[in-house]
Amino acid sequence: MAWNRTSVACSALCAALSACVAPRSIGVDAVDVRLVAEDTTWRAAYLTGQQELPTGREVHVPVGADVRLVLTSRTYISDFRLPELGLRDFAAPDLPSELRFRAARAGRYDVRGDELCGRPHTEKTRGWLVVEDAASFQAWIRKQRRGSQQ
């Protein structure tokens, strides 16, 4: 009898602890974006199944969506910052990293970056994160798809 209670208590404790340390999952309303640093520029591409949708230096996401940014670099180690959202990470060749977040309010946020080579590239590595309502996001995606097919 004591053995069963102990087993149940241990199982419950393990489940509670794993819930605390498990990474937040990407939900149904998720946006996956690959950001690639190359020389002095960030390039964004939405990961949509088997295809990528390139969008340049601007990333749009709907308010409240789970967002996963996959960072990598083709050339140097690069710094990626979204200071208004408290996000920062590094992109390195052959070493992808991820940032996950949920943007709670609409707005246009500055993406800042810098190559870690000592030369100033702030303006060239700048980009934008646009957080908007779902209808505006879908309209923007449709516009990007039309542009990529031309």
Q: Where in the sequence are the language-model features?
A:
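Non-transmembrane, membrane-proximal soluble domains of secreted or membrane proteins
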Residues: A2-S7, S11-Q150
